[in-house]
C-alpha cells in the first residue's frame, strides 16, 4: 500500500498546514508559531458526518482480515514518518523528543495500531446443548465520533481510531483545539491507506465537540478528557441514546507500604507521577506514605527528581517539558500556592520562574500536607506531587478512596500478597503494584466512579465498538 513519506518535519507540516485561512498554534515552550490549524464550522462537521455515513455503507461490509491489513498499513505509515511526527508533536504539545515523550508517543501509536489489528475476535458460543445453540457476534455500530485531549494527542487518537476502524465503523476525529496539527498529521496518514470517506477530521473549539456529541447521525462517542466535559457529553448525547466510552479525570492515589526500600522505588514513583510533566490522566497525583519511612521516601524521591532535566523539547537532553497551555499552568500555580499558604513543606520546586518564556513550572514535591488540601483533592494535572503521611493503613485506604474519581491507583510493597490485599480494597478501574500508569494494549483500561465508563484496549475494548448480536436456534 502506497502512503506518503516525509523526509522532514517541514515537509509534513506543509502537507497539513491550513495556511492563511487557519489560526495560529503556538509552541508552549517558546510561544513561537508552529503552524496554522483549520477552523471548521458546524456546517463542516455536518458534511464530515454525512460523508462518514456514506462511506460506512461499503466499509462496514469489509472483513476483519481486510480491516486488519489496512491497520497494519497505517502502522507502517506511522513508522515511516516517525521522526517528522515526533518533531511536530514536540513543537505543538511541548513534550521533549526524548524520554517517555514525543518519540515514545509516536512509537506507542504504531505499536497500538498493530496490537489492535492482532486481537482475535471469534464468534462466542453461549449455549450448545440438546435444546439450544446460541452464538454472540459483534457487528459495526455506524459512525463513531472520536474527541481527544491535548496531553497525549496522537496516542489517544489511535486508541479511539484504530479499534473503531477494526470493528467496521467509520470515524469523525475531533482533536483538542490546543493540539490539532499532530492529530491532523496522524489522520492524514490513516486516510492515505483507508477507503475514501472512512476517516473524517474536524478542527475547532468546543462548539464543534458539542455538535458532534449531539449529532443525530453519530452512533457512538469516544472521549478522553475532564469529568466536567464528560458530563456535558452525556447530557448532549442522551436524546439520541448514543453509546459512550468515557475516560475522564483521575487524581490517582498511590499507597506506599512500610516494607519497601525507598531508594528502590524512587525512580518508578517519580515517573509514575511526572511522566509527560504530570499531564497524564492515569498519573500518580497523590502519594500516601507511612510515618515510619516517610522522611526516607521524601529524601529518595527528592534526590532523584532534582536531577531530571526540564526544558525546550527539541533539546535532546531534556525529558520534562512545559505545561501545554496557560490555563493549565495557572491551575498548577494556584494549587501549589494554596499548599504553601497552608503550611505544607516544599521539598523541591514550588516557585515560578519570572524569566520564563513558555509555560514551564518546576518539578515540585510537597510534604507535610493535609489530606483535605486542594492540591490533594483537586486534580493538578502538572508537575506537583503532594506526599501525605499516614500512621494507619486502613485510614490511608479510606483517604485514597474518598474522592469521587477512580481511574488508576497503585500499591508499593515488597510483599506481593500484602500488596494484592491492599489493591483489592482500592476503588479504581486499575490498580498497579510497584508501578503506576503502565498501560498495555492487551489489557482493558477504564475508570470507576466519575472517572468514566466503558473500557478501551484489548478484545473487551473492541467489543465496546461493536453492536452485540445474538443468534439462537431452538
Question: Where are the language model's segments positioned?
Answer:
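Short, well-ordered beta-strand elements within core beta-sheets of diverse protein domains
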Residues: 34-40, 54-61, 146, 254-257, ...
Amino acid at each position: 500500500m502506497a502512503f506518503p513519506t516525509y523526509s522532514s518535519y517541514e515537509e509534513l507540516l506543509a502537507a497539513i498546514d491550513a495556511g492563511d485561512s487557519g489560526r495560529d498554534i503556538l509552541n508552549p515552550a517558546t510561544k513561537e508559531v508552529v503552524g496554522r490549524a483549520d477552523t471548521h464550522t458546524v456546517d463542516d462537521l455536518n458534511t464530515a458526518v454525512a460523508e462518514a455515513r456514506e462511506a460506512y455503507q461499503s466499509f462496514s461490509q469489509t472483513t476483519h482480515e481486510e480491516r486488519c491489513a489496512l491497520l497494519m498499513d497505517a502502522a507502517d505509515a506511522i513508522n515511516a514518518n516517525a521522526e517528522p511526527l515526533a518533531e511536530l508533536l514536540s513543537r505543538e504539545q511541548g513534550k521533549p523528543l526524548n524520554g517517555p515523550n514525543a518519540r515514545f508517543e509516536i512509537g506507542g501509536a504504531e505499536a497500538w495500531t498493530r496490537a489492535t489489528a492482532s486481537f482475535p475476535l471469534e464468534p462466542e458460543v453461549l449455549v450448545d446443548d440438546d435444546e439450544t445453540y446460541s452464538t454472540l457476534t459483534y457487528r459495526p455500530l455506524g459512525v463513531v465520533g472520536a474527541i481527544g485531549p491535548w496531553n497525549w494527542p496522537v496516542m489517544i487518537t489511535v486508541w479511539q481510531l484504530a479499534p473503531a476502524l477494526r470493528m467496521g465503523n467509520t470515524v469523525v476525529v475531533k482533536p483538542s483545539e490546543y493540539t490539532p496539527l499532530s492529530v491532523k498529521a496522524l489522520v492524514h496518514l490513516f486516510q492515505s491507506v483507508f477507503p475514501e470517506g472512512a476517516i473524517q477530521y474536524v478542527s475547532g473549539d468546543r462548539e464543534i465537540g458539542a455538535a458532534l456529541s449531539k449529532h443525530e447521525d453519530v452512533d457512538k462517542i469516544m472521549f478522553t478528557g475532564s469529568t466536567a466535559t464528560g458530563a456535558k457529553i452525556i447530557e448532549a448525547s442522551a436524546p439520541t441514546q448514543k453509546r459512550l466510552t468515557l475516560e475522564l479525570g483521575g487524581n490517582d492515589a498511590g499507597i506506599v507500604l512500610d516494607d519497601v526500600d525507598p531508594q528502590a522505588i524512587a525512580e518508578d514513583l517519580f515517573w509514575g507521577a511526572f511522566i509527560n510533566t504530570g499531564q497524564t490522566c492515569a498519573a500518580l497525583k497523590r502519594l500516601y506514605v507511612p510515618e515510619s519511612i516517610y522522611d526516607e521516601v521524601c529524601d529518595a524521591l527528592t534526590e532523584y527528581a532534582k536531577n531530571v532535566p526540564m526544558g525546550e523539547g527539541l533539546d535532546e537532553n531534556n525529558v520534562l517539558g512545559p505545561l501545554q497551555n496557560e490555563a493549565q499552568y495557572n491551575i498548577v500555580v494556584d494549587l501549589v500556592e494554596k499548599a504553601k499558604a497552608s503550611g505544607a513543606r516544599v521539598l523541591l520546586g514550588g516557585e515560578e520562574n519570572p524569566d520564563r518564556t513558555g509555560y514551564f513550572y518546576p518539578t515540585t514535591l510537597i510534604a507535610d500536607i493535609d489530606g483535605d488540601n486542594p492540591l490533594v483533592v483537586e486534580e493538578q494535572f502538572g508537575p506537583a506531587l503532594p506526599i501525605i503521611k499516614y500512621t494507619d493503613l486502613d485510614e490511608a485506604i479510606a483517604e485514597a478512596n474518598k474522592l469521587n474519581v477512580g481511574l488508576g491507583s497503585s500499591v508499593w510493597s515488597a510483599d506481593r500478597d500484602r500488596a494484592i490485599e491492599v489493591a483489592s480494597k482500592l476503588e479504581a478501574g486499575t490498580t498497579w503494584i510497584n508501578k503506576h500508569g503502565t498501560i498495555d494494549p492487551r489489557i482493558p483500561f477504564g475508570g470507576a466512579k466519575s472517572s468514566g465508563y466503558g473500557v478501551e484496549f484489548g478484545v473487551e475494548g473492541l467489543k465496546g465498538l461493536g453492536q452485540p448480536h445474538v443468534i439462537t436456534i431452538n
